[in-house]
Structures are given as C-alpha cells and as structure tokens.
From Swiss-Prot:
Protein name as it appears in the record: Urease accessory protein UreF
Domain of life: Bacteria
GO cellular component, one term: cytoplasm
Taxonomic lineage from the root: Bacteria, Pseudomonadati, Pseudomonadota, Gammaproteobacteria, Enterobacterales
Major location (coarse): cytoplasm
Subcellular location: Cytoplasm
Job of this protein: Required for maturation of urease via the functional incorporation of the urease nickel metallocenter.
Pfam families linked: UreF
UniProt keywords, alphabetically: Chaperone, Cytoplasm, Nickel insertion
Annotated organism of origin: Enterobacter sp. (strain 638)
Record text on subunit structure and interactions: UreD, UreF and UreG form a complex that acts as a GTP-hydrolysis-dependent molecular chaperone, activating the urease apoprotein by helping to assemble the nickel containing metallocenter of UreC. The UreE protein probably delivers the nickel.
Gene Ontology MF terms in the entry: nickel cation binding
Similarity annotation: Belongs to the UreF family.
C-alpha cells in the first residue's frame, strides 16, 4: 500500500499537468530555431543531447542529489549553498527567471500539500524547483534515484513538446525522440550521480547566446 502511494506521488510530480510552467519556457530553443541552427528532428536531437550531457548531467542532476542529501539531514545551510550555486550556473537572466518562477509555483503547491512545512525552507523552494522537489521527495519517502528519473523524463518531455511547436515535427517523431532521449538519459545517469564537487558546472555557450538573444526576438511563443 505504502509503495503504491509513493509511486502515485512520483507520477504526479512527473506529470505534464503539474502547474509550474514547464511548458512556457524554451531554454533558448526558440531562438536556435529562428537562427536556423535547428531545422529537423535530427538536429533537435543533437541539440538536446548536448544540453543533457553538458548541462543537465553536469549541473541539474548532481546538484539535485546534493539538495536531496541536505534535505535528508535537515541541513538548510547546505541546501542554501547548493541552491545559490544552481542559480549561479544559469547563464542568462531568462534562465534564472525560469528557475525562480518554477520554484515559486512549486512552493505554492508544497504549501498546499504540506502546510506544516518548516518556514525556513520556503524561501529556498521559491528560488529553485529542484530544492522543493528534493524536500518533498524526502517528506514523501521517494528515493533520490526515482526522483532523478522523474526529473529527467519531465525535462525531456518539456523539450520535445517545445520542439513540436517550433522545429516543427509531428507527434510520432516526438514519441520516438522521447524514447531515444530517455535511453540516452538512462545510460548517463550513473556517471552524473557520481560527479564530485570539483566537476560541477556547465559550458554551453550556444545555449546561453540563444537564451540571451531570445529576449529581443521579434515574435515569440515562449516566455522570456
């Protein structure tokens, strides 16, 4: 019974219907398409694999693991440090605003689901959804590994759905891309899990340029 409950909670957290605005940001993809860098589903796949290998595996995933451990130990000082580190790794104002907006939306959910959440943690959640997700995973007794898979799938699905609108490509291609990118994520998960503190950080200059240029793009579907 308890395991079933945990699995259902995990499905809820990975659901595309979770009201945190994940489908309102393109993370630079919209400008990359406008610039002609991405014109096919194959080019989209290469772009997303680069983002996964050079950013998600180097920043998001290893920092999530550190945040989860901090929440396990009720260590708000460490959680504050890693949340600040995460924001520092977001290379543009648009990416930082996305992080904070999603964090604020997720904080509202946590306050509704867990009204007895300690007040000192709420400002951290509002800075990053990753911190709130880690705390909620500990509270709901969902393992870090399962939550990491959920985060990866949500990230992949959001990116592919943005690609459907922007590149564009059809739903059949989208489902194939989700499978292929999920396989790539599963293959790289363990290495990302073992990254040391001195291996944290991303170098994705094209993504940063695309995100920065998106602000002045003449016509946009996604937020900036």
């Amino acid at each position: 019974m308890e395991h079933n409950r945990q699995q259902l909670r995990l499905m809820q957290l990975s659901s595309s219907s979770l009201p945190v605005g994940s489908f309102t940001w393109s993370q630079g993809l919209e400008w990359a398409v406008e610039a002609g860098w991405i014109t096919t589903d194959a080019e989209f796949k290469r772009w997303q694999i680069q983002q996964m290998e050079q950013s998600f595996f180097c920043v998001d995933l290893p920092l999530f693991i550190r945040l989860y451990r901090a929440c396990e130990q009720n260590d708000a000082v460490s959680a504050r440090r890693w949340t600040a580190y995460l924001l520092a790794c977001r290379e543009t104002r648009e990416l930082r605003e996305e992080e904070r907006n999603r964090g604020a939306a997720f904080t509202r959910l946590i306050k509704s689901w867990e009204p007895d959440c300690p007040q000192e943690w709420l400002p951290l959640f509002s800075q990053s959804q990753l911190c709130g997700m880690a705390w909620l995973g500990v509270r709901w007794e969902i393992s870090a590994h399962e939550l990491a898979l959920s985060l990866g799938y949500s990230w992949i699905e959001s990116a592919v759905m943005a690609g459907v609108k922007l590149v564009p490509f059809g739903q059949q291609a989208a489902q194939r891309l989700i499978i292929e990118l999920s396989d790539h994520f599963a293959a790289g998960l363990e290495h990302a899990w073992r990254r040391g503190d001195d291996e944290l950080g991303a170098a994705t200059p094209l993504s940063a340029i695309a995100s920065a240029r998106h602000e002045t793009q003449y016509s946009r579907l996604f937020r900036s």
